[in-house]
Curated annotation (Swiss-Prot):
Source organism phylogeny: Viruses, Riboviria, Orthornavirae, Pisuviricota, Pisoniviricetes
InterPro entries reported in the protein's UniProt record: Calicivirus_coat (IPR004005), Rhv-like (IPR033703), Viral_coat (IPR029053)
Subunit annotation: Homodimer. Homomultimer. Interacts with the minor capsid protein VP2. May bind to VP3 and Vpg proteins.
Family: Belongs to the caliciviridae capsid protein family.
Keywords: Capsid protein, Host cytoplasm, T=3 icosahedral capsid protein, Virion
Chain positions of site Cleavage: 157-158
UniProt protein name: Capsid protein VP1
Keyword Lipid biosynthesis tagged: no
Organism name: Canine calicivirus (strain 48) (CaCV)
Gene Ontology, cellular component aspect: host cell cytoplasm; T=3 icosahedral viral capsid
Disulfide partners: none
Function statement: Capsid protein self assembles to form an icosahedral capsid with a T=3 symmetry, about 38 nm in diameter, and consisting of 180 capsid proteins. A smaller form of capsid with a diameter of 23 nm might be capsid proteins assembled as icosahedron with T=1 symmetry. The capsid encapsulates the genomic RNA and is decorated with VP2 proteins.
């Protein structure tokens, strides 16, 4: 981008001039600055423009850009050495400078600047950059000697005067329709009948919540905590969907039921932004007021908007808090017996006189608050592992319905499962007592209890797919031949207090529910006891590793794991995805070792394990009717679009795609956001599309 002058070496030779101690042209800077209407040329250290040495890795020559076509629209830079005569500067300026389209001269950006012994200036900065900088400079100092050929004009679309080439919202072709009879009169009657008035949602209190204050609540107990936000009011929360930001205070009205009967006081504390609301009576160190339970009239508090910026975005939680806590215990003189009584505090809210919304947006567009979904799928398929059971993803399958709770997370970090998004040993403690009391062999039904659970005392990592109903176990040390549709694994000692006396690592089968005789009854809901069926003659801590699937039929190793909803285990809710807008749920298929099939049984996974881990760690910005779309491309060139929805399930644009045409390894590329109701695209060999 830069153009270099043909310089005489003697003018800038370090052997002839030492610029730190000798200046051969003492009037050089003054003469140069005079061409630009300034008195001096400021000195700038280019190193100050970079944060650290790592920044230089991105550009090894910041003064000579690698993209001249792009920067040509912004401007051109030129520099000269101090050894050059001032007339060369003037000549170079006149040769380089040009005229704008309107005939005005292209004045250089003011002022030029110096680095070391080199002076830079911009004779042709580009019209947009030039005029923007001039407008900013002139706004800071009206007396600054700058030249602006054409001043910018900023206006709203609704301004009355506008250029003819701009269409405003009040322009357009009027379509003839039947006139509304007496429109002004009808509008007046409607206003009179409904009481509609401008911004009426600001003028009255709306119910927000209720607080229970009991005689058993001790001094310092926090009854109510609320940060300043539009969601405090139902109308503000509704209107907020159309705006990007807000500012202003809110008023909160408290009404205590039973006033005049109860005694006691509560304190209303205003906590500034950025300070924790924990601490009980310590909160009374902040500004506060006291409210007596005998107060018969409602009490109104104002939560002021204390902020360090001009306005808040809709996700801003660094706002003031209103805390209501017990100051004096509630007393009911008519209370009889030891049972406590309580009163109810009704909370109503409205916007303050200074409350306003800012920056209009369509209600259907979502604010970008969460993490970027572009990293939800690893780029290379070599790193794709299923979230149901260990195994690398080898294919995909379209399903009319997809269901999975365990290790399945949505974009808000929520799960209905009981396992962390990682495949590891299941940490339990086994009881040596055999529930099959009549058994005289070494195989028994043993209760295991979770040592590491995240929900409902279910062992973290417990399998979510095996037979529902009765399961009979063949009590022999040689085989589990009668066991069908079950997960088998191995057990290893873990942090035992005494030496283990096992002669070998036991093989176990997973079950839960109730155990009677040589069978267990497994329900769809994980409840009751959890069992490890195997050879245990000693209690202690163990780890269980699911590693094998006992199939039902001899042929093909049985149905895929995850295919039947009745066999999918859950705690209460089973997240389910179904066809939407022409897009079908897709399962990630991996393989798991199985009987009757040397290639293993297929496993339907709702997510890639890495996706589950990322969703568990952070909130992602995926709207309720949106998809984060990735292009999955095979080595042979075939591809299809895969979209991840807000509930964590994945979709593709057809119900019968030829995934067999894909050649592994695959590569995932983030495309962007799309509507859930727009059909996703694909280009797979042998696939046909019906319009």
């Amino acid at each position: 981008m830069a153009r270099y002058l043909e310089l005489n070496p003697q003018n800038y030779s370090d052997e002839e001039y030492d610029y730190d101690s000798y200046n051969p042209f003492p009037n050089f800077e003054k003469n140069l600055a005079s061409h630009y209407g300034t008195d001096f040329v400021p000195r700038i250290n280019l190193d100050d423009f970079f944060l650290d040495d790592e920044d230089f890795e991105f550009c090894d020559d910041p003064l000579n850009c690698c993209f001249p076509d792009y920067l040509a629209s912004l401007g051109e830079e030129e520099f000269i050495y101090e050894g050059d005569e001032p007339y060369i500067v003037l000549k170079h300026q006149l040769v380089s400078s040009t005229m704008w389209d309107d005939g005005t001269f292209t004045y250089p950006i003011l002022p030029p600047f110096k680095t070391s012994s080199i002076s830079y200036f911009l004779p042709k900065p580009g019209e947009v950059l030039h005029r923007c900088l001039m407008a900013v400079a002139k706004g800071m100092d009206p007396d600054l000697q700058v030249a602006v050929g054409t001043e910018f004009q900023f206006r709203a679309e609704s301004d009355s005067s506008h250029p003819p080439d701009i269409t405003t919202e009040d322009q357009g072709t009027v379509v003839a329709t039947g006139p509304q009879p007496s429109a002004p009169a009808m509008a007046t009657l409607a206003t009179a009948a409904t009481g509609t008035m401008p911004e009426e949602w600001k003028n009255f209190f709306s119910y927000y919540t209720t607080i229970n204050w009991a005689t058993t609540d001790e001094t310092g107990k926090v009854l109510f905590v609320q940060n300043l936000a539009p969601r405090m009011n139902p109308f503000l929360d509704h209107i907020a969907k159309m705006y990007t930001g807000w500012s202003g205070s809110m008023e909160v009205r408290f009404t205590i039921s039973g006033s005049g009967v109860f005694g006691g006081k509560v304190a209303a504390v205003l906590v500034p932004p950025g300070i924790s609301t924990e601490g009980g009576t310590n909160l009374l160190q902040f500004p506060h007021v006291l409210v007596d339970a005998r107060q018969t009239e409602p009490v109104i508090f104002t939560i002021p908007d204390i902020r360090t910026q001009l306005w808040h975005d809709m996700h801003d939680t660094s706002t003031s808090h209103l805390v209501i806590l017990v100051y004096n215990d509630l007393v009911n003189p008519f209370q009889g017996g030891e049972n406590g009584t309580s009163c109810t505090i009704t909370v109503e809210t409205r916007g303050g006189t200074d409350f306003e919304f800012h920056l209009l947006k369509p209600p259907t567009r979502k604010m970008i608050f969460g993490a970027d979904p572009s990293r939800l799928i690893p780029r290379r398929s070599q790193f794709w592992e299923g979230n149901r059971l260990p195994g690398v993803i080898t294919s995909f399958v379209c399903l009319p319905r997809m269901f999975q709770a365990n290790r399945h997370f949505d974009c808000k970090r929520q799960t209905f499962g009981w396992s962390r998004p990682v495949h590891k040993g299941i940490e339990v403690r086994v009881d040596a007592t055999n529930k099959d009391a009549a058994n005289t062999t070494d195989i028994g039904i043993h209760v295991v209890t979770a040592r590491n659970a995240i929900k409902s005392d279910i062992p973290d990592g417990w399998p979510d797919y095996y037979r529902t109903g009765e399961q009979v176990y063949n009590n022999t040390t040689q085989t589990f031949q009668e066991v069908k549709e079950s997960v088998m694994g191995s057990a290893v000692p873990d942090s035992t207090a005494t030496a283990m006396t096992w002669h070998h690592l036991p093989t176990v089968v997973f079950g839960h529910g109730t155990a009677v005789g040589s069978k267990t009854t497994n329900s769809k809901v994980l409840s009751g006891n959890f069992y490890a069926i195997g050879n245990f003659d000693q209690s202690g801590n163990i780890k269980l590793y699911p590693s094998y699937w006992i199939a039902k039929e001899q042929s093909a190793g049985g149905a895929p794991i995850g295919a039947y909803e009745d066999m999918v285990k859950r705690i209460d809710v089973l997240p389910t995805a179904q066809t939407t807008g022409g897009n079908f749920p897709v399962a990630f298929v991996s393989k798991f070792a199985s009987s009757h099939n040397g290639n293993g049984v297929s496993v339907y996974n709702s997510q890639i394990l890495t996706t589950s881990a990322l969703l568990a760690q952070d909130v992602y910005d995926i709207g309720p009717n949106a998809l984060a779309v990735f292009k999955i491309k095979g080595s042979g060139g075939y591809w299809f679009d895969l979209g991840i929805s807000a509930d964590g399930f994945s979709y593709v644009g057809g119900g019968n795609l030829n995934f067999s045409s894909l050649q592994f390894p695959l590569e995932a590329t983030y495309v962007g956001m799309a509507s859930l109701h727009n059909k996703l695209q694909y280009n797979l060999g042998g696939s046909a599309t019906t319009l």
